[in-house]
Amino acid sequence: MRFKAKILLAMVTVGLTAPAIAGLVLKKTPYFASIAAGKARMRTGPAKTYPASWLYQRADLPVKVLDVYDRGAWIKIEDPSGTQGWMMGTLISDTRTGLVMGTIAELRDSPRYGGKIVWRAAPGVVGRLSKCARGWCYFDVRGRGGFVEANHLWGVATEESLN
């Protein structure tokens, strides 16, 4: 009897913690994430049997998570160009990144228009995001960073706050 109780308890524990381990499952969609792998296939449906529609070769590219299938095994995403499809959940990271859109983004030493410009980033540059508040985010590109207006980036909402 004790053995069966231990097995049952273990099964319940695994069942309750599995979504927490996946991480992505617990969030309400849509939300921003990024591609974790250097090569990642987008598919037309949530299984390896569906054909690949795109091969991404850019780790940290920001994506918008639209749906989660099979407890996080498959994630429906949208890329910065608006293309939608499915990726394996293991290829998606919670790491927040942004992509410079439109014109050159000015990175400043403080989150305000009067801040000194310390770097400039061209359209298409991807960087890590942090400290987002009141329409500004700290944008780090391989150790060189500064504050940029969130509306110059794809991968963060202008009203969003990040630590």
What feature does the model see in each segment?
Residues 17-19:
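N-terminal signal peptide c-region/cleavage motif recognized by signal peptidases
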Residues 51-52:
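Beta-strand-rich domains and repeat architectures in extracellular enzymes and scaffolds
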Residues 13-15:
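Repetitive helical segments and hydrophobic/amphipathic motifs
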